[in-house]
Structures are given as structure tokens and as C-alpha cells.
């Protein structure tokens, strides 16, 4: 099955899945992943609301931690965002649990209706070495090649 670059993201996700490729998509925006560091978001919100919400949540956490007013303003693509989240006491493992629970609450493949939903937690688990399926595949490959583990 071949799709062009003009096909919908849903078809792209289905094509990736059918080829054993997992996608780290979010609906409505990547920033949902950041929101899960603070709260278990189960109701939809507009992508236009994310920056303000993240700014507010980080400021509240920083004020609780330091006792001082925070001047933090969320900036898209900030390479320090993970450090900011962890630095103000956010729990990455809790974010993974909440994102995973919300993702599992949807069962159909009409991904556009999965709102809010993010698969970024799967990428984070992979990067942290916590993806059990991936780890088993790597162990099997290493064993097959005679590599020490």
C-alpha cells in the first residue's frame, strides 16, 4: 500500500503501523506531553491553549518549590524543556502513566478522534530504555549475533 505526502495523517499512521513502525503522534499538539507532567488531562483542549497552560503550570510549580514568583514563559521547541519540567519537580514516570492510560482509553483507529492523546510516552520509554518489547528484540538480535549482554 502506497500513500502520497498529501494523504491524511491517519493514513500515514496506519501505513507506519502496518510496516512495524510506531509513531509518536499527539492530538492536538506535542505540548500535551508536557501537560501530562502536571496533570492527568482527559478532556480536549485547543492547541492554542497549550502555551498559556504550560506557562501557568510551570510558574505554579516553581513558586511552590522556591517560594518566589516565576517569570517562566513557555517557548515552543525550547531544548531545555525537559530540564525545566524535571527541575520544578515534575514526575516523568507519572506523565508516562497518565499518557498511556489516556491512550489506552481509545480503541478505534480513527486517531483524529483521540483527543486528548499522545504517543510521545512510547518514544520516551524507548529513549529511557524502558520499552520492554524493544529491549527483548534487541536482546534477541544480540544473542543471535553471539554478542555479550
Predicted segments with their positions:
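C-terminal accessory helical subdomains adjacent to catalytic cores in phosphodiester-
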Residues: 2-149
Amino acid at each position: 500500500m502506497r500513500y502520497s505526502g498529501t494523504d491524511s495523517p491517519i493514513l500515514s499512521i496506519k501505513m507506519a503501523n502496518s510496516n512495524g513502525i510506531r509513531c509518536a503522534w499527539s492530538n492536538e499538539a506535542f505540548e500535551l506531553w508536557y501537560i501530562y507532567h502536571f496533570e492527568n488531562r482527559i478532556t480536549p483542549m485547543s492547541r492554542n491553549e497549550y502555551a498559556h497552560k504550560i506557562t501557568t503550570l510551570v510558574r505554579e510549580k516553581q513558586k511552590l518549590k522556591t517560594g518566589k514568583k516565576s517569570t517562566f514563559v513557555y517557548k515552543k521547541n525550547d531544548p531545555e524543556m525537559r530540564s525545566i519540567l524535571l527541575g520544578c519537580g515534575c514526575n516523568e514516570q507519572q506523565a508516562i502513566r497518565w499518557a498511556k492510560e489516556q491512550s489506552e482509553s481509545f480503541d478505534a483507529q480513527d486517531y483524529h478522534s483521540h483527543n486528548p492523546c499522545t504517543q510521545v510516552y512510547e518514544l520516551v520509554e524507548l529513549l529511557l530504555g524502558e520499552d520492554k518489547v524493544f529491549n527483548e528484540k534487541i536482546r534477541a538480535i544480540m544473542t543471535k549475533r553471539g554478542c555479550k549482554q
